[in-house]
Amino acid sequence: MSELCSVPRVSERFAQSNALDEDIARLKYVSGKREEALRRLGIRTVGDLLLHIPHRYLDFTRSWSIEMAPIGTVCTIVATVDRIVQKQPRPRMQVTEVSLVDETGVLQVAFFRQPWIAQQLKQGDRLAVMGKVEFAYGFKQMASPHFEKLEDGRAAGTILPVHYVSDGVSQAWMRRIVSGALEVVSNPFDPIPARLRVKRRLMSNARALRSIHFPSSMAERDIARARLAYEECLYLQLALRLRNDGGLVDVVPYAHTAGEHLAALKQALPFSLSDEQEAAFKDILHDMCDGGRVMNRLLLGDVGTGKTAVAACALAVAADSGTQSCVMAPTGVLARQYADKTGPLLSQAGMSWALLTGATPAAEREQIHAQLESGELDVLFGTHAVLSDDVAFKHLSLVVIDEQHRFGVGQRNALRAKGPGADLLVMTATPIPRTLALSVYGDLDTSIIRHRPVPGAGVTTRVLTESSRDLAYGAIREAYEKGQQAYVICPLVEPSDSADELEDVPGIARDDEGRVTVPVPLHDTATELDRLRLALPGLTVERLHGRMPAGEKDRVIDAFKRGEIDVLVSTTVIEVGVDVPNATVMVIENGERFGLAALHQLRGRVGRGSVSGTCLVMTHSKGNGGASAAQDRLQSLEKTSDGFTLAQMDLRLRHEGEILGYRQHGGVTLRFVDLDADEDLIEWAHLDAVELLRYACNLDSVATRPLRDAVATRYRHIFKEVSGG
């Protein structure tokens, strides 16, 4: 362990940690309105301020004269304001024209719908502008460029950071404040052991913080970002693993053994496990039979890849060992579906099972409780109802959680507490890139199933604009005439709903601050229900959404499964748990509002039987600007059916939280890590976290305690989950 960690001087560590925890009000230049503005940005301490990194930079080390600036490229030009003119070429269209001059020529700059710029600038001001250079009417021009007023003594030849700011703090003041904070912590203690810094060739913490805010070159900025990204990843990995291990202190892992139940179950399966399924089960079996450690495994599988069959094999191993297992699903529909599909296979393998949900009658519930306590039941399928205090197992040794991102850590731990030392298998059908899985689910070992064991009929996807709506309705009518069914998916429940109602929609589009962005119009289930009943006379159309009582939801889904409903208008509540092989058409309204991974999940609800499915994604994109980009993104759905490929595309375009659903990863925001580009760095952090905890359990040694303190400070909300706070 001495190679990994050296013991820091306590006085040095204490002084520097105190400096980072200092309130921003103690900093030079911070008082009154500036303090309020910083707090609005979530900046309360010196540490918060130093982690509030620039979102872009103005690189004046590569500035051009007006004459030499190449047309058609993005350039930085430093010049002087010569003239400011405001125009209004048409109603509600305001243009501020600024003429910039240097010794080589004139640059005409136009700012659209930004009238306040005329008040910010005056003749003689020295400006740096960065934008695409165009040529028209005899002059070089820029439209709405990024600009910086050079009023703080900085000249061309430097790199200026551009931070997110709030009213009351200008960019110039933010730079002064950050510079003052860096002086306060001029040599901050580095919690990452020196051995790791050398091994990974990392910049020191002090230099990285200075270089990320005030780099001497963009190359230096990149090296600083890499250091801070590694630190962020390592801290997150450690926080997740410490949280996970927090409830496992002093437990004795159970060593399972495979036997007759497993052999009988494999015989009962209607197909042989694919190579990928066998590999995943081999991982699980190795974990379950290892009496030296408790299993913590994530099973990732695209829609229809056969995760349930793999999980059923794990249930059989638990039964072979004379112990019990519990499968918890997020909805009653999904729990019942598990019981309906997996239960008969378990029965054929000689295993007993039961289903427990909130709708289970009292008498049946009491019988299940008694059978669990006596050990008569091998497997319990259920919802949150299994977390009830009166549910007790004789010997619970395996916990399986499906769509685990829909459960909180507390719920996961509450179920696991019913069987101290129980192995944990969590599953999700949301394709997640490996880098994201390592970062956000770093406390879990991962097995991946990418391909379907038995190729299905497949799904054809088309992106349609509003002008092609008749094609969508025609597809629904055609399916009905063939005796098939359809889904219509809307982002909202009621027409009166606002953006707030979209907060938990997986993959919903957001701005840089995480706020839902809403176009007009947004489709809702109530309006769409009425519209479809008018457009498709003779068809039975009903709706489904998450606000309905559980019993009503079950009634609608059961009716749809029985074929009594021809068209189901629904929110994304059907994304998980509705398996109707006769449903062959899906129409998704406002497709541009969803991430690719979420759309892929939705279309996985059709084409599940012997008949191929059709998914029609409706969009209001007009084909220009950002709308064109949205349409290009959607068209990638037409080209690939691989959920992991789509998830990787999503990762390049959207925040990590939008792939998982904004709150599903516990409020963790990755500031520095580029999940698309930092695969090696993320792998390093993962390996180093495992090694650190192997040598220093809980990081509670003298040498590693500073690192634990730093992790606890950065991810204090995760550590609260350890202590139940």
Task: For each feature predicted by the language model, list its residue ranges.
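Accessory helical-bundle/CTD segments and flexible terminal tails appended to RecA-like ATPase motors
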Residues: 558-581, 586-589, 604, 608, ...
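OB-fold nucleic-acid-binding modules
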Residues: 52-82
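Upstream accessory/linker segments immediately N-terminal to the RecA-like ATPase cores of bacterial MutS
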Residues: 34, 71, 87-268, 662
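Long, highly charged, low-complexity intrinsically disordered interaction regions
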Residues: 1-28, 36, 236, 246
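Inter-lobe coupling/hinge segments of SF2-like helicase ATPases
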Residues: 290-635
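Short, surface-exposed secondary-structure boundary micro-motifs
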Residues: 80, 132-133, 239, 591, ...
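N-terminal pre-P-loop "Q-motif" helix
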Residues: 271-295, 309
